[in-house]
């Protein structure tokens, strides 16, 4: 019986000693009801929560907090700004717009772009596809350099009207020119 009591006391001791503040020593913001917390209070609470955590590895950080990869400009052709753009997007998420020719229904465009997406996957180019209009889709690439390889494939397709990367339009080979 005494050993149980001693074990119980030993188990409860860390819980009692682990309390960070005594009631009278708490800061004013910590005495508030949680429903009355301001953004600054919540930010302070988050900082306390994360103060003892180890920093995340570079690949675990959100994309906007990751360090920029070093660009090797010695291998680039200075006459091609496209190559510079391609290298600068390595490891970064990039969205491209892809348009389908003609006046297709949403289902028809969905089928065509799904076929293109599967062809890209078969070529080891990872792209997510989102339909944004009846004849337009967004292809999202986790590695931005793959977007230019995908562009080369897509503009060769029979029903591709054009691909837009970084506000630059690349017309499809089989797309008819719009006459003014």
Swiss-Prot record:
GO terms for molecular function: identical protein binding. Residues 93-166 are annotated as: Structured core. Residues 48-78 are annotated as: Disordered. Transmembrane segments: none annotated. Keywords: Chaperone, Endoplasmic reticulum, Signal, Wnt signaling pathway. It comes from the Eukaryota. PROSITE patterns: ER_TARGET. PANTHER family: LRP CHAPERONE MESD, MESODERM DEVELOPMENT CANDIDATE 2. Chaperone specifically assisting the folding of beta-propeller/EGF modules within the family of low-density lipoprotein receptors (LDLRs). Acts as a modulator of the Wg pathway, since some LDLRs are coreceptors for the canonical Wnt pathway. This is LDLR chaperone boca.
């Amino acid at each position: 019986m005494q050993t149980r009591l001693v074990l119980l006391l030993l188990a409860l001791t860390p819980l009692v000693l682990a309390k960070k503040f005594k009631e009278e020593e708490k800061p004013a913001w910590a005495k508030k009801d949680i429903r009355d917390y301001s953004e600054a209070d919540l930010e302070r609470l988050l900082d306390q929560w994360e103060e003892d955590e180890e920093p995340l590895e570079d690949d675990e950080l959100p994309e906007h907090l990751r360090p920029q990869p070093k660009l090797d400009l010695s291998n680039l052709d200075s006459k091609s700004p496209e190559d510079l753009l391609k290298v600068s997007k390595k490891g970064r998420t990039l969205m491209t717009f892809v348009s389908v020719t003609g006046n297709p229904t949403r289902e028809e465009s969905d089928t065509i772009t799904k076929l293109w997406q599967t062809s890209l996957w078969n070529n080891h180019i990872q792209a997510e596809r989102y339909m944004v209009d009846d004849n337009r889709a967004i292809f999202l690439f986790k590695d931005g350099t793959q977007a230019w390889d995908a562009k080369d494939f897509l503009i060769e397709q029979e029903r591709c009207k054009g691909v837009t990367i970084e506000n630059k339009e690349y017309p499809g080979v089989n797309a008819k020119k719009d006459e003014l």
